[in-house]
Amino acid sequence: MATTIFGEHYISNQEYAKKLILAGLKQPTYRIEVDYIDFKVRGIGLSYFCNGERVSSGLFEKPGIYVLYENYPGADNCLYCGISGNSANNRIRRFMKGLCDCLRHDETHAAGTKARQFGVSFKNIHFKFLAEEDFPDKHNCILDDRYMDEYVASLLNTRFNKKVKQ
């Protein structure tokens, strides 16, 4: 635990990021399947699967943190970690559009685009999602939530996130 200048103990961003990772590891792994790509209108259709069963994208229409993997989740496969204040589904979709080279002129997702440029295929992307409502208790924390995904990304050694200095 970190200590303030007044001698009070608190949980730092780094320590809280570790708690998020542990909570996220308990979540199911989802597979993303690209149903179609329409280059004319710059659209994409996605389906999500868990244990071979199709699941609704509505599960991810809420705030939370998500981690995308190439192939199955593992130490060397972590592509990107993101956090959404509204809909994780929208952010996952934007990453996939960047990966499929299907972004409109008014859309960007640097990590998705960079992953495509480094040869990552959209055909075997998996992810884990932790809804904000399931985040660990923030009692006794002094957090900067704006950068929490970067702290998690740094611990997971993602390939396409900006990294925070430790």
Question: Language-model segments: what does each one mean?
Answer:
Residues M1-L79, I83-Q166:
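Boundary/linker segments flanking structured domains
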